[in-house]
Structure formats: structure tokens, C-alpha cells
From Swiss-Prot:
Homooctamer. Dimer of tetramers. Its cofactor is FMN; NADPH; Mg(2+). It catalyses: isopentenyl diphosphate = dimethylallyl diphosphate. Pfam families: FMN_dh (PF01070). InterPro entries: Aldolase_TIM, FMN-dep_DH, IPdP_isomerase. GO terms for molecular function: FMN binding; isopentenyl-diphosphate delta-isomerase activity; magnesium ion binding; NADPH binding; oxidoreductase activity. Keywords: Cytoplasm, Flavoprotein, FMN, Isomerase, Isoprene biosynthesis, Magnesium, Metal-binding, NADP. Mg(2+) binds at residue 166. Its EC number is 5.3.3.2. One of its GO terms (cellular component) is cytoplasm. This is Isopentenyl-diphosphate delta-isomerase. It comes from Mycobacterium marinum (strain ATCC BAA-535 / M). It is found in: Cytoplasm.
């Protein structure tokens, strides 16, 4: 793939346009969360006002178990989007992932694009997670990645494994051979917690088994399952590349979010776990956390509000958090720990 910052910036803008204006959700695959019921307790002994949504992730306190998911960076509009997202995150006390910082690795023109990731001024206290692709995470790139993280004031690094997205992308990075070893080496060299994530096609049991077979065991500090059922980046890339859907089966391929949560949590009982991929409501979040996630991440539903204003983002998220609070209250959970203890019921 080209490393030209101008080409990367143009592609990022096309991603934004497609996500705003086209149907990019999975069609034949759901998150699987609808197959679970959060138990309703008519005799709850909780007070809605006393429900505690606080959480901790990578050692950072959060007022609610929510991260704003990775969206964009490098396009002209990205700066506005990211600053509005970060401002809302600061106001609500939640975390935020940046979009891919690949463009910042370019020594020449990437410096100009770096401003689109500069959010610390408006979000000094936010858990901020940087972002780079697994295909770009070579040992040689580690110093540049570390510099990019320092420049934006990140607390951690998300590494996105996106083989299907890259296969659909014009000129995409399609050589993932040796990427597990590179991930291990980079995680050892970086002085940051590393979060391994997908982009909407899911991390499940098979991927975790590969990670655990590496010398030294699990090389990352946490996992974001980024499951299927929400935005399909295979679909997005086809629409960007061809203007149409040429491979519909590939647009609907992935591990549903609920399935991914269960598989990863069973294999890794104590590893920090993010549930993302089609998380659209407070009820979705409650089910995901009851299944074993520590926090949830939300991305595309916040894109249009983020173009409008930080207040619009905050308003969307406040409704989401209000619903999550009611879910805990009406199932009898005072906090997230008791929510996990209550769990969910599979619908047969």
C-alpha cells in the first residue's frame, strides 16, 4: 500500500463519506446480543440514583464503562471530529481511542496530519488510546510508533488486526505473515499497554489460541473483540473502492460480537476485555458486560454527532448511559460487578 499521506488522507475522507451516506451495516449477521435476555427483577432493591457505573481500564478510572471507539484521523474533517469526541469524553469521564495513526509515521508530510489527532488540550484527563495497524507494526517502525503516541499524549496503544478490510482495500496491506511475532516483539519494546483489536469482523477463540502459543504467552495487555453485527469494514472498503458491493458474502463475514465476548472471556478470564461491534444501546452494553466485557466501545453512531458538535456527542452518549443505568437498576445490580454476577439468560 502507498504510504503517501495525501493518499491516506483522501481515503480517510472517503471512509467518512461512505459511513455517513451509505448502508454499511452487516445485513445477514447480527451481534448475537439479541439471543440473550437481561433478567428483569420486579423487586429490585436498588435506587436508580445510587447506581454506580464506574469502571477501570488499563489502570485508568472511568465514570462509566465506555470508550469512544476508533474512527478517523488524517483527513481535514478528522480534527473537528476528534476534538468533539474528546471534549465529550472529558465531560463524561469516559475513554477514547484514536483512529489509525499510520499517517503520522511519515517523516515528511505526516507532521501536518498529526494535528487531527491532537486532543489533549480539550481532554487532559481522558484515557487516550493510540492506534496503529498490525500490518504496519514492524520492529523498525516501533520508534516512530512510540513517537506518535508521545506526541498525542496517549496512555496506551490499540493494534488493529484487519486482514479482511485490507484485502478489500485498493492497494491494501495483505501480507500478514509473521505478524504475530512482530506483535510480540513490538509489545516487548513499547512502554505502553497494548490492546489488540479487530475492526468489526471479530476476534475469537482461534485467534486467542494463536496468541497463547507464542513464546512468553499472551503478548498484549487487553483485547477488543470488535465483533460482527455493526459496521462491516469489508462493506465500507468495497463501496469506497468500487462504488458498489462486489463481494456480498465477504461483507457479511465475521464472528458475532456476543460469540466473540464469550469465547475470549472463557479463554482469558482475567484479561481486560472491550466489547465493540454493533453496540448501539445501553441494553446492548449491559448484556455485553454481563457476558464478561469490562467496557464497551462505540464508534459509528457518534460520527454524525461529532461532525455537528461536542454537545451533540455528549447528548447521544448521555442517553446511552441513562439507559445502561436503568438496565442495572431494573435487574437488581448496584454496580458492574453485581451485573456480571447476575449475568444473562440465553434465549433458546
Amino acid at each position: 500500500m502507498t504510504n503517501d499521506p495525501a493518499e491516506i488522507s483522501s481515503r480517510k475522507r472517503r471512509h467518512i463519506d461512505v459511513c455517513l451516506n451509505d448502508e454499511v451495516n452487516y445485513v445477514g449477521v447480527t451481534t448475537g446480543l439479541e439471543r440473550y435476555r437481561l433478567p428483569f427483577n420486579a423487586l429490585t432493591q436498588t435506587s436508580l440514583a445510587d447506581i454506580d457505573l464506574s469502571a477501570e481500564f488499563f489502570g485508568a478510572p472511568l465514570r462509566a464503562p465506555v470508550l469512544i471507539g476508533a474512527m478517523t484521523g488524517g483527513a481535514e474533517l478528522s480534527a473537528t471530529i476528534n476534538r468533539n469526541l474528546a471534549t465529550a469524553a472529558q465531560r463524561l469521564g469516559i475513554g477514547m481511542m484514536l483512529g489509525s495513526q499510520r499517517i503520522m509515521l511519515d517523516d515528511a508530510r505526516g507532521q501536518r496530519a498529526a494535528s487531527s489527532f491532537a486532543v489533549r488540550e480539550v481532554a487532559p484527563d481522558v484515557l487516550l488510546i493510540g492506534n496503529i495497524g498490525l500490518a504496519q507494526l514492524t520492529k523498525a517502525a516501533v520508534p516512530a510508533v512510540a513517537a506518535a503516541l508521545r506526541r498525542v499524549g496517549a496512555n496506551a496503544l490499540a493494534v488493529h488486526a484487519n486482514s479482511l478490510q485490507e484485502a478489500m482495500q485498493h492497494g491494501g496491506d495483505t501480507d500478514f505473515s509473521g505478524s504475530l511475532g512482530r506483535l510480540r516483539d513490538a509489545a516487548d519494546l513499547l512502554d505502553y499497554p497494548v490492546l489488540l483489536k479487530e475492526v468489526g469482523h471479530g476476534i475469537g477463540a482461534a485467534a486467542v489460541a494463536q496468541l497463547l502459543r507464542l513464546p512468553g504467552g499472551l503478548p498484549v495487555s487487553g483485547i477488543d473483540v470488535a465483533g460482527a453485527g455493526g459496521t462491516s469494514w469489508s462493506r465500507v472498503e468495497q463501496l469506497v473502492r468500487y462504488g458498489e458491493l462486489r463481494y456480498p458474502e465477504l461483507a457479511d463475514w465475521g464472528i458475532p460480537t456476543a460469540e466473540a465476548i464469550v469465547e475470549v472471556r472463557q479463554a482469558l478470564p482475567a484479561v481486560p476485555l472491550v466489547a465493540s461491534g454493533g453496540i448501539r444501546t445501553g441494553m446492548d452494553a449491559a448484556k455485553a458486560i454481563a457476558l464478561g466485557a469490562d467496557v464497551v466501545a462505540i464508534a459509528r453512531p457518534l460520527l454524525a454527532p461529532a461532525i455537528e458538535s461536542a454537545t451533540a456527542v455528549q447528548g447521544w452518549l448521555q442517553l446511552f448511559l441513562d439507559e445502561l443505568r436503568v438496565c442495572l437498576h431494573c435487574c437488581g445490580a448496584r454496580d458492574l460487578t453485581s451485573l456480571r454476577d447476575i449475568g444473562v439468560t440465553a434465549i433458546r
